[in-house]
Amino acid sequence: MRKDVYNFIRDYWHSWFPKLPSYQAFCRRLNNLVPAFQALAEIWSGMLCAQFEESVQYIIDSCPIILAKQSRSGSAKVAKDFCDKSYNSSRQEYYYGVKLHSLVIRRASSLPVAETLMLSKASVFDLTAAKMMFLNTPPAHRGWLLADKAYCDSEWADTLRTEHGIKIVTPRRQKKGDTLKSGDAYSTAVSLRRQPIESFFNWINSKFHIQTASFVRSSTGLLFHVFANIAAAMLFKLFNS
């Protein structure tokens, strides 16, 4: 994306930017703007979430941001302070990178709105990251939290209910010898209610290619890739909501 922007400015708007630096200097200056993109993403996300009533349906999940995959995942060393190697079960492959954890608000007949987003190393468990998210940035609304089985934890469920007024709903864990069909139907219903977050991840990836980061060469470059794209996504939704 940065290369395309740079080439477009150089080819079509150079008279407006006669002192356009080299591409390397251009990238360094963009990397210095990471805190600004972080702040803009938070501001625009807050503006989108302000429209909701006091009680909402949250959905929580994560998606991988991949710097290297398969055979190259074991030897990758870029941004080691943020990245590591893990296995992605949905893609059935090992990758080196980070996870983007997302707490979104479900909307009828529309893409959900992200209230909280957090980066972690790829190997961090989703439940561990979720606890950190709620501790560092308490949710702005009460209501329900739709999650998958990775978030099942009775102690955390009690904390959500007593401290945040949120009841977590997950697919039922099948017990040994349990053949109740109603349990399967319940789990299917929960999964269907969670489907919008998959649509959210697919949308942000198709529009902004956030999950593809093989071109990243530094920690600041990774942060720029993530937060500049998140800010762009929030701004896009703000003008199209």
Predicted regions and their residues:
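Short alpha-helical elements
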Residues: 1-241
